[in-house]
Amino acid sequence: MSFQVKQIQGSKSDLKIIEIFNETTSAKIVLNQGASLQELTLNTIPLIQKLDPLKYQDTFASSILFPFVNRIKDGIYSFENNAYQTEINEVHRNNALHGYLYDKEFQVVNQILESHKATIVFEYIETKFTKGFPFTYKIQLVYEIQNDSLGLKVNVLNTSSKTFPFTIGWHPYFTSSDLYNSRLTFDSTKKVLFDDDLIPLGTEMFNESEIVIQNKKLDHCFFLNTNLVDFNTPTYKLELRSSSDNSFLQVYTPPKENVIALEPTTGISNSFNNKIGLRKLSPNQEFEIVWKLQITNHQ
C-alpha cells in the first residue's frame, strides 16, 4: 500500500494537522504549531505520542528551534556591535526560550507519495522583523517517511540584507514502554554546567559510556564527538543521527512517565552570548541540516 496524505481537524478546532500514513507507519504534523511532528509510528511501533495533559506551549514538542536553541539570558545579546532585546517567553526565569518557529503556520508546498516512502515539504516565510531579531528568512522542512525511518531536512535562507546569528535544533519527545530500563548511548566527554535558570556556567568532564535512565531527572546538555545517538528501550532500538559535524545533545525528562526529550542541536543554551556553536548566515546564503530517526531492531 502506497503512502497517503490527508488533512484532519485536531481535537482542538484550531489545529491544522497533516497525516501521512500507510498500513504500518504514520506521522501527524501540525501546520500551525511550526509544522511540528506530534505523532510518529514506524513499523507499528509508537515512537512519538501526544503529551497530554502537558501543553504544547510548555513542552515545545518536536518544534524546530530557530534562530536560537534553548535560552537567551534575559533576552539580551549583542551582534556586530548592535545590542538586542528579545521578548521574554520564559517569564519565571526571565529568558527567551526556543526561538520563533514553534507557533508559526507552515504551508505544504510539495508532496511525493510512493509505495516505499512519502516526502512532504513544508515552508514558512518570515517577512516581518521580530523584536530582538530584525531579520527575515525562509524555512523549508522536508519530512521523508519510510516504514522504518524518518528524515527531517531543514533549509534556512537568509532573505534579509544583513547577516544574522543563529543556532538550530529539534525538540522531539520519545515514548518508551519502560523508561526506567531504557538506555542512552553516545560518544561524549564533556557536558554543560547550568545555573538555576538553566544558563551555562561552564563545562565538566563526562566519562560514562551510557546513561541508564532509571528515575533520573534529566535536563543536561552534552558535547557530542560523533553525530550518532542510540536510544535503547525494551521494545525498540532507535538511532538518531545528525548531518552536522559540530553537534550537541540536550536530554530532558518532562513531568510525564515514560517520555524523554532527545534534542539534537548545533549550539547550547545562551549561545547568542557565549558563542558556543553560534553560526552566521549572510544575505542570500542557505544553511541545511538533516536529522534522521532509524529503527534498527524491534520486537
Annotate the PLM regions:
Residues 1-8, 12, 89-146:
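Extended, loop-rich substrate-binding clefts of extracytoplasmic carbohydrate-active enzymes
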Residues 1-47, 277, 297-298:
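Generic N-terminal segment detector
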Residues 25, 95-111, 201-203, 209-277, ...:
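Acidic/His-leaning functional-site neighborhoods
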Residues 26-83:
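Acidic-aromatic substrate-binding/catalytic surfaces of carbohydrate-active enzymes
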Residues 77-85, 280-296:
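Short Pro-Gly-centered flexible turn/kink motifs
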Residues 84-86, 91, 162-165, 172-243:
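Active-site/ligand-binding surface loops and adjacent short beta/alpha elements
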Residues 160-161, 297:
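Short, acidic/polar linear motifs in exposed loop/turn regions
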